[in-house]
Amino acid sequence: MASAKLLQDLLQAARQSTGHDEIVRAEDAFFKALLKSTVYAHVPLEPPPPGRMRFVQFVRPDNGQTVLPFFSDREQAEFAAGNVRAIIAMAGRELLEQTRGATLMLNPNVDQIALYPAEVDAILAGQSIGTFSKEVITESEQVGACPPSCPTDALTSILREHFATEPWVRAAYLVELHRGPEFADISLFLGLVVAGAHHERLLQLTTLWLKTALKDWSMPLSILLCNPDEKLPEIFHQGIQFYGT
């Protein structure tokens, strides 16, 4: 079993990593250790029906999603449980297997790591879930934008297939960006119009879908999500719309 301290150290390493490959290795190491760690979850005080296991869930105040909390150490679990919930300990792999189909949140009062069902399936299968980092384009930066000049049919086909099952995705755009000295740094920009409560979920799932289906994709890809009631960013109009109306 991996200790709670080791798990926290691996999480810290993943958050401090910078380069893409370094982040992937750190996150893979963290989730591999999570499966082998003892984790803690909340269950009702009253006993469950014979042959069944019941877990406590809560509704996130930030987006209204129902999540099942679990914890990497007993102290966090006890603090959150108070006197109204019981605590159960089990291996991380066992918890993920028993709660398949639920959205999980690791250490909701500290780390707030949301794991959606498709990500849980990937972790249990020993696969990477996809990696992203936040980036800021300043107003002073000169950026060129145009429709994609490289083949993108595989990318847009995969995303259209998945977005068709997500009613919260209203539209999707793809733009080619030119940045850096002489605009020589080329990347793709994916713009999504998504209901605000589902921004996090669609960001994480889109990253997973692309990681799983396009293993040989090498061009950097940035993602920006905006709400349906917001004015569409001008940069969206510089590329192509491949989904929605």
Predicted feature residues:
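An interfacial alpha-helical scaffold signature
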Residues: 1-245
